[in-house]
């Protein structure tokens, strides 16, 4: 059971790391912004990499409504994370180096050549946070039936990380864990020492090697084509500058946030232009040539025909699609990124109408109401470089690193 807990803990920590201020993109996209606006955005981004302590609140939500073939009329998940965060000097330096990695290859190189960065980051990073998860009733019922255990619609998991020990209040989490019945209160896991041991034993080098698309495909077994396709797509899209020609950024009207003047930058992605571009064709053909899409992959002739159809029907198919991000920057010096959000929303009405007309979807499977996919993320930052008091729970039971590693080896 502890090996499963270890995997879960790593996922939780990685989730919290996704909105680390020091991991901000090194060079923001400026597009056609004027010099002053680009300088403001760039300076704020650079300042974020020197933030040693702050508070943050994040929201991640996904919603599927009225999709043909989906056994649920609606499935929604909302994850909220809030807390205080701090880094010591070594962790901040490590985070700055990790933040400079802009591609899958960069990350793999750091894992292979500098595993100590990950050790320094986790041993010197502290936080006191809570993760709140809310799922729709239909989805909770479906998950419960599949898992054979009652999945609640709401779940709260308090977390504290300090001195390399991750403390988890398992009171609400325990009923969902195998063998967790009766567990409650705080449990501390020596995660920092586990990461140190993993680095010493070459686990990071092995993980870096497994990030190679060919290795992923070989490890995928029967699903090797899918694994290779996913890795190929990730590699193709790992360069943040590769698709800038399909992006636009504008400075919208400034806003007031708790008495602070905030500049608002909105970046949009032109999906229709992208899928009509040579870059999109090259991306797909690269996957075809690699064999990642399997024996039924489209041929060059298929792609040419498909591109012609997209040119005719694309506006109808994608008229309900929005893909944009918003960055909020404090205007007064020192400027910081006080908020970021992303939105992918697709009203599928046009696509489903066309599918019904072609006979791809039977009339009796067409949704009667709204049909859409929406994914939203938001992060708000504050209290930059102010002292954050992060205390460890006094009554926590500690699980030693040796016990965690021994359990992982036997499972």
Predicted stretch roles:
Residues 1-9:
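Bacterial N-terminal signal peptides that target proteins for export
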Residues 19-23:
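Sec/Tat signal peptide C-region and signal peptidase I cleavage site
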Residues 25-411:
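Subset-of-secretome marker
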Residues 9-18:
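Bacterial N-terminal signal peptides
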């Amino acid at each position: 059971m502890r090996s499963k807990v270890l995997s879960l803990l790593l996922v939780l920590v990685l989730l919290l790391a996704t909105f680390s201020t020091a991991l901000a993109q090194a060079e923001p996209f400026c597009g056609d912004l004027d010099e002053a606006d680009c300088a403001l955005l760039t300076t704020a981004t650079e300042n974020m990499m020197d933030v040693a302590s702050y508070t943050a609140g994040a929201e991640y939500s996904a919603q599927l409504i009225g999709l043909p073939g989906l056994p649920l009329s609606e499935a929604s998940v909302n994850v909220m994370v809030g807390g205080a965060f701090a880094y010591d000097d070594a962790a901040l330096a490590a985070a700055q180096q990790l933040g400079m990695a802009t591609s899958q290859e960069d990350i793999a190189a750091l894992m292979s050549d500098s595993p100590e960065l990950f050790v320094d980051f986790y041993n010197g990073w502290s936080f006191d946070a809570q993760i709140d998860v809310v799922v729709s009733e239909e989805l909770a019922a479906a998950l419960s039936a599949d898992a054979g255990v009652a999945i609640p619609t709401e779940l709260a998991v308090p977390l504290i990380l300090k001195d390399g020990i991750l403390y988890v209040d398992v009171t609400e989490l325990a009923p969902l864990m195998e063998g967790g019945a009766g567990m409650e209160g705080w449990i501390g896991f020596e995660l920092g020492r586990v990461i140190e041991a993993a680095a010493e034993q070459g686990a990071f080098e092995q993980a870096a090697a497994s990030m190679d698309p060919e290795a992923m495909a070989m490890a995928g077994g029967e699903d090797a084509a899918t694994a290779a396709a996913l890795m190929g797509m990730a590699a193709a899209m790992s360069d943040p500058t590769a698709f800038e020609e399909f992006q636009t950024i504008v400075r919208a009207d400034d806003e007031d946030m708790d008495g602070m003047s905030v500049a608002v930058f909105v970046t949009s992605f032109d999906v229709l232009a992208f899928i009509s571009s040579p870059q999109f064709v090259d991306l797909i053909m690269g996957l075809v040539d690699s064999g990642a899409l399997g024996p039924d992959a489209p041929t060059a002739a298929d792609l040419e025909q498909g591109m012609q159809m997209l040119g005719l029907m694309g506006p109808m198919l994608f008229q309900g699609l929005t893909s944009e991000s918003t960055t909020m920057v404090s205007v007064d010096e020192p400027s910081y990124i006080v908020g970021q959000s992303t939105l992918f929303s697709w009203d599928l009405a046009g696509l489903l109408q066309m599918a019904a007309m072609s006979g791809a979807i039977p009339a009796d499977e067409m949704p009667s109401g709204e049909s859409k996919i929406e994914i939203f993320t938001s992060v708000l930052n504050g209290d930059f470089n102010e002292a954050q008091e992060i205390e460890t729970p006094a009554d926590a039971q500690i699980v030693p690193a040796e016990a965690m590693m021994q359990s992982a080896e036997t499972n």
